[in-house]
């Protein structure tokens, strides 16, 4: 229906099924933008907190869609540096990355044993990292053609728009929506 009416669309998923041949056949490469979320590269660890495709399957799906000519990105959401082997990820051949930093609430504190002391900013029920810490973390994300930040802490949004993201009009850097 979206293809028929000429609408652009964004698919954000943790499922590798989006790269199954039956789905590839119905998506329009000129209209579809796909982001596949990965929080860790460890299949076993991931299964303790996510009911989704294994990260290894998601990586394969991204590469298949990329090879097929789709506008696709890996979405590190949330990005928790202790959980992602960035060197290994950079060697996969994935071109584009969207980073969304962890925002911490009570549920997150119960699930993940990490140091939350640097999450000092508060907004809408969540603790967030200071901008300086986010910039420091981004220095480690290398080896990709494009890195974009998706920000939900309102005081940082303009920074990414004006100084970092390749497309200042679109925080997800969807190439199909670029004028």
What residues fall within each predicted segment?
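Conserved AdoMet/S-adenosylmethionine-binding subsite of the radical SAM
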Residues: 1-137
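C-terminal accessory extensions appended to soluble enzyme cores
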Residues: 108-179
């Amino acid at each position: 229906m979206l293809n028929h009416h000429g609408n652009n669309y964004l698919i954000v998923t943790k499922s590798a099924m989006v790269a199954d041949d039956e789905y590839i056949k119905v998506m329009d490469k000129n209209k579809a933008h796909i982001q596949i979320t990965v929080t860790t590269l460890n299949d076993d660890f991931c299964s303790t907190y996510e009911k989704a495709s294994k990260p290894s399957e998601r990586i394969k799906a991204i590469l298949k869609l990329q090879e097929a000519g789709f506008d696709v990105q890996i979405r590190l959401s949330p990005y928790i540096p202790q959980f992602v082997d960035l060197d290994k990820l950079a060697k996969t051949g994935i071109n584009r990355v969207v980073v969304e930093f962890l925002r911490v609430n009570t549920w997150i504190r119960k699930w993940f044993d990490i140091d939350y002391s640097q999450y000092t900013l508060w907004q809408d029920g969540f603790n967030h990292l200071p901008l300086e810490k986010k910039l420091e973390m981004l220095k480690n994300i290398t080896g990709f053609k494009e890195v974009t930040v998706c920000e939900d802490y309102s005081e940082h949004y303009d920074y990414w728009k004006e100084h970092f993201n390749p497309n200042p009009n679109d925080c997800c850097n969807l190439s199909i929506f670029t004028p």
